[in-house]
């Protein structure tokens, strides 16, 4: 029962990892532990993006632990000058602690909030970290986010043998199910390998014999689109694959179109290799660039029927595409990073997409007209549906009393006659 009094004594201050334990849904997806794996994986991928990692391994262990290992530089083990604890302990136990705020250590990265792995620690029964760095091997462990053992050296390794291994066991009380969604995880791992050419990712499900996979791509997006669209009819024999770079931003995309619903719909967007399921600035910029280039192409070649206007959805509805953006200091909508809110990046993507597609369309006019035809058909269908809805509203008018009801027959809208206005619902006994 709530107290009537409200004074300073009622104010609570959550410290350490308590905010995560109190409101886990604000920091991760609590439907299953997949997002915890992604948080650890993203740290390893950030090492790969910076050129310090070429191998990542993920294992689902028989005892319920999940292990993510990389051959990056290894988490810092020296003492932090201000907080007086090792770098690895600070990263695992303190929210908003990390080396990715300034951009000095990572040009492009996804772990920008300094929250990810500390959330994993907070929501795990047990977590163990092994670091190989400076010819030494170190270990530290945690229980429910609290340090269980101090960082200690446990061995020596070769100078070039570096990396970080994090093994954790998700606490089931924080999740709807503690089962990892393996299909979704594999899709994510494959996409990471595609978006970071030269990176090898190994997956091993120890709970199921023979469930092992390795992903390695040299030509990235092109291979990914070809594999993902297997079994679907495509308009273009060769997909459009492009890349643009500036000092602080990069854009890569691959796109093709299908004249009928594809077997597997591909409409994926990524920022610094993090999947943005809700799109955001980069997707909006991409759609804008596609629309502007195709509209200009159609207008120049007089392809549009009089009075018909195409929109971005008309252009992209029949498309299979993957968009990968990289930028410094991206602004995400929340910790789960499902939507990008970096407004400046939208104009970068839009202008570059338009330039690339405009050149392509005007050098591949026959294929360009096929793409335009799909957009025009979509726009015409949309216009017909809109007209039906508007006519329906016009005919509907005020609600009719008693047994009289509005006629909902398509005939009313296609070929109305004076007799087709009202239908009388008669009782079955009449």
Label each region the model flagged.
Residues 1-10, 33, 38, 46-49, ...:
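GHKL-family ATPase ATP-binding module
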Residues 22-37:
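Conserved short strand/loop->alpha-helix "switch" segment adjacent to the catalytic nucleotide/phosphoryl-transfer site
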Residues 413-420:
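Conserved small/polar residues in nucleotide/adenosyl-binding loops
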Residues 424-430:
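Hydrophobic alpha-helical segments, chiefly the membrane-spanning helices
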Residues 16-17:
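Alpha-helix capping/hinge segments and adjacent helical runs
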Residues 74:
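Short acidic, Gly/Ser-rich segments with clustered Asp/Glu that frequently serve as metal-coordination loops
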Residues 78-98:
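Short conserved segment of the HATPase_c
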